[in-house]
């Protein structure tokens, strides 16, 4: 029973709950970035470059069995080794956008923290200073 109580204390700590919330929000945010990359940015890049779909860019590394269409999905299903560089380009762009957004968020938080420096310590009241002087003078007497 002590194990369950220890686990409950561990799980209810603030850091664990904050981490769980961060993971959930991060997963949802990752889906937004995926959509941004796949639905908005990559179509623009493919329009400029002239390719319609980056995810289907690949190099076939071996002969395909007879009758297998030469599409990435069909070749993978047939077990043909392929070098799928188009998917890598999409994932790399996705990562760069996500990293840039996280950088902007951390930068904004850092600026907010730096903008509010800690308050200077309050001056010691005069009566406390006097009491300290008396204490120090009593310590010095033989």
Swiss-Prot record:
Q: Does the keyword Transmembrane apply?
A: yes
Which ranges does the record mark as transmembrane? 16-36, 86-106
Under InterPro entries, the record lists: Mechanosensitive_channel_CS, MS_channel, MSC/AndL, MscL_channel
Q: What is this protein called?
A: Large-conductance mechanosensitive channel
What PROSITE patterns does this protein's entry cite? MSCL
Gene Ontology CC terms: plasma membrane
Record carries keyword Transcription = no
> How would you summarize the oligomeric state and partners of this protein?
Homopentamer.
Q: Which UniProt keywords apply?
A: Cell inner membrane, Cell membrane, Ion channel, Ion transport, Membrane, Transmembrane, Transmembrane helix, Transport
Specify the domain of life of the species encoding this protein: Bacteria
Please explain the role this protein plays, according to its UniProt record.
Channel that opens in response to stretch forces in the membrane lipid bilayer. May participate in the regulation of osmotic pressure changes within the cell.
User: What does the similarity note say?
Assistant: Belongs to the MscL family.
Q: How does it sit in the membrane?
A: Multi-pass membrane protein
What's a single GO MF annotation on this record?
Answer: mechanosensitive monoatomic ion channel activity
Q: Where located?
A: Cell inner membrane
């Amino acid at each position: 029973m002590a194990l369950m109580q220890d686990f409950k204390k561990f799980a209810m700590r603030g850091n664990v709950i904050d981490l769980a919330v961060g993971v959930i929000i991060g997963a949802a945010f990752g889906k937004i970035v995926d959509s941004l990359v796949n639905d908005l940015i990559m179509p623009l890049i493919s329009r400029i470059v002239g390719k319609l779909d980056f995810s289907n860019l690949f190099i076939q590394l071996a002969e395909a069995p007879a009758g297998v269409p030469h599409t990435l999905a069909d070749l993978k299903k047939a077990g043909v080794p392929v070098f799928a560089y188009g998917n890598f380009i999409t994932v790399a762009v996705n990562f760069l956008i996500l990293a840039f957004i996280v950088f902007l968020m951390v930068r904004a938080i850092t600026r907010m923290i730096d903008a509010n420096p800690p308050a200077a310590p309050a001056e010691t009241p005069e009566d406390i200073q006097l009491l300290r002087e008396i204490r120090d003078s009593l310590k010095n007497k033989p």
